[in-house]
């Protein structure tokens, strides 16, 4: 008895998501195809959607002359102990906040700059 398309569809519908993912990868390898959608060229040039960054890192690039003030702010922002905050301030560039939202990153940057540090937000 020959296997029909309906038999294949019924079998595939019974697979888990992980099994489906593995099956797609095997199809891509065996037949040299990609599961990515093909972009259709139109008469007008399509605008590329720019993905807005949602997670930011706050990095001290220079502690400046007022290191004690910067250390205090680093401790307040991170909850680090005195030694860890001092090390983070002296061993620049040093990431103070990682994976935070834009507002938190900008507030941290403002506080650190007011204390005398030079800061980057990436």
From Swiss-Prot:
Primary role: Forms part of the ribosomal stalk which helps the ribosome interact with GTP-bound translation factors. Is thus essential for accurate translation.
Protein name: Large ribosomal subunit protein bL12
Subunit structure: Homodimer. Part of the ribosomal stalk of the 50S ribosomal subunit. Forms a multimeric L10(L12)X complex, where L10 forms an elongated spine to which 2 to 4 L12 dimers bind in a sequential fashion. Binds GTP-bound translation factors.
Pfam families: Ribosomal_L12, Ribosomal_L12_N
High-level lineage: Bacteria, Pseudomonadati, Campylobacterota, Epsilonproteobacteria, Campylobacterales
InterPro entries in alphabetical order: Ribosomal_bL12, Ribosomal_bL12_C, Ribosomal_bL12_C/ClpS-like, Ribosomal_bL12_oligo, Ribosomal_bL12_oligo_N_sf
Gene of this entry: rplL
Recorded family membership: Belongs to the bacterial ribosomal protein bL12 family.
An individual GO BP term: translation
GO terms, molecular function: mRNA binding; structural constituent of ribosome
HAMAP family per UniProt: Ribosomal_bL12
Keyword entries, A-Z: Ribonucleoprotein, Ribosomal protein
GO cellular component: cytosolic large ribosomal subunit
UniProt cross-references to PANTHER family, sorted A to Z: 39S RIBOSOMAL PROTEIN L12, LARGE RIBOSOMAL SUBUNIT PROTEIN BL12M
């Amino acid at each position: 008895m020959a296997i029909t398309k309906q038999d294949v569809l019924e079998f595939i519908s019974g697979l888990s998501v992980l099994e489906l993912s593995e099956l797609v990868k095997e199809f891509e390898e065996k037949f040299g195809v990609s599961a990515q959608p093909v972009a259709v060229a139109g008469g007008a040039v399509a605008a590329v959607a720019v993905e807005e960054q949602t997670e930011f890192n706050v990095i001290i690039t220079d502690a400046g002359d007022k290191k004690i003030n910067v250390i205090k702010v680093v401790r307040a922002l991170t909850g680090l102990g005195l030694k860890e905050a001092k090390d983070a301030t002296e061993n620049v560039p040093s990431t103070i906040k990682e994976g935070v939202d834009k507002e938190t990153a900008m507030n941290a940057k403002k506080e650190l700059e007011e204390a005398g540090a030079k800061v980057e937000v990436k």
